């Protein structure tokens, strides 16, 4: 599952995730930004791309909500960052974009993992 596909179809990814969360087994870290001016003037079939793909941190998805919903529903999998989609950070800047996405996604899920010293099993 990834939110970019829902946004490109003008589907609210958070509303969909709330319904599907228990069925998610893999998560892609890919995003998009919907250009609502283009949609309002030309519709979704305009010559201009109304929803260019982005790496997380540069798009419209609320990744804090994504992680919260998945956590509340028992998701323990990883997030695979999909690169090579954001033209602003293409070529020599690709790894910069992907590292930013990694740091951003870690922040959205609550930061680096710190074990609870009082959680004795």
Question: Each PLM stretch: what is its role?
Answer:
Residues 1-121:
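Histidine-acidic metal/acid-base catalytic patches
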């Amino acid at each position: 599952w990834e939110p970019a596909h829902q946004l490109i179809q003008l589907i609210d990814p958070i509303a969909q995730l709330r319904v599907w969360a228990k069925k998610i087994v893999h998560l892609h870290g890919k995003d998009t930004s919907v250009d609502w001016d283009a949609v309002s003037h030309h519709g979704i079939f305009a010559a201009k791309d109304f929803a260019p793909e982005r790496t997380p941190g540069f798009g419209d998805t609320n990744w804090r909500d994504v992680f919260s919903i998945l956590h509340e529903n028992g998701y323990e999998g990883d997030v695979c960052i999909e690169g090579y989609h954001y033209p602003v950070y293409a070529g020599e800047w690709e790894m910069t974009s992907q590292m930013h996405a990694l740091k951003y996604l870690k922040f959205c899920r609550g930061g680096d993992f710190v074990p609870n010293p009082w959680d004795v099993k």
